[in-house]
């Protein structure tokens, strides 16, 4: 499981709730959350959900909506931010990881300023952003990334 997502959950939630993973990939985070008692739904292009378009779950609203390493790939980034907002319950939390524009190993043009603007325009509150370095130790990678993290509430 994304260790930063786990830390965020441990800080913000006293007990398991409902979560939505936008861009779930191999559904690893979904499986990990289920193991610790969360009710979790994951969607991805692999199961027919195009995040360039609006997605509203039949299981909404969620306590947590998160997306890891998807936003920088999308052309319609405002749509993903709106999808997060529309699937969250009031006072629910979001968590986003993507690559920062300073990352030399990805093709991202995202900055803290731009992402904060998108989030504020959508109506999110308690927004926190940070950029940090992370060593990607996966097979065939072995390099550093600059991660852009955004969290906040509806």
Per-region residue spans from a language model:
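Conserved alpha-helix/loop element of class I SAM-dependent methyltransferases that forms part
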Residues: 1-16
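Conserved class I S-adenosyl-L-methionine
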Residues: 16-25
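Adenosine-cofactor binding site in Rossmann-like domains, unifying the SAM/SAH pocket
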Residues: 40-57
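A conserved beta-strand element that flanks and buttresses the S-adenosyl-L-methionine
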Residues: 66
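A short glycine-rich, Lys/Arg-flanked "PGG" loop and its adjoining helix->strand segment in the class I
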Residues: 78-90
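Short alpha-helix
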Residues: 108-123, 130
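Core SAM-dependent methyltransferase catalytic element
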Residues: 137-154
